[in-house]
Amino acid sequence: MMEAFPWLEFCLPPCPEPAQERSYEYIESISSPRILTFHGWPHLTPQGLPNTKYILLLRNPKDVAVSMYHHLRGKKSISYQNNWNDFFELYLSGQVHYGSWFDFHLHWEKFLSSRQQVLYLTYEELKKNIKTCLSQLAAFLEIKVSAEVIDKVAIGSKLEEMKKNDKADCNWMRTNQNEAPHLRKGIVGDWRNYFTEEQNQRFNDLYIKKMSGSKFKDYWDESILGITRED
């Protein structure tokens, strides 16, 4: 996966194995147009490139919490050992990788507001209408593709298919076979199996407070996020 779409953050120290060759010089050597993946804050992205196109993929922050919890438990360089309740407190207070989900997305929203070429996608929409999203993506990138190619990519993007691909599954990140793999469930709404009623209410209160002025606030309906929209 990283060979096709290098992770830009691996240019930043410390550079984890087996990505030592993913240096800044390596990224610079890739001819344009190039596709780079990035999980970090916007101020760390390459600047002064006016033709850059940005694709921001968002996911329900409650599912993000559960996914991050399992990801950190299985990652070699971290191997988080505490339970879900402890992790929830860290997540809610922003004491996790990349900091507060709220601040992270508010910074990206502000950063992208001054950019002309931006495509917003949600994980939930990808799960629901993958072919439509792929068509939008191809149009945004100005890539002409046939319906057959869209069908093939849609099939290859299914979690069951990606798990068969060692490069996509990123097994090198795992600590041991007892932990969750890099590609775990990939479902929408798994947070309901983890959040207690009290945790859910606390998160909802903070979400409404922090995201009140954001256009991302209503990206997910009540059935997904579990927060009633205000008309």
How would you name each of these model-derived features?
Residues 151-164, 171-172:
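Active-site/pore-lining binding-face segments in mid-to-C-terminal subdomains
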Residues 1-121, 148, 167-231:
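PAPS-dependent sulfotransferase catalytic domain
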Residues 121-145, 153, 161, 204:
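PAPS/PAP-binding and catalytic site of the sulfotransferase fold
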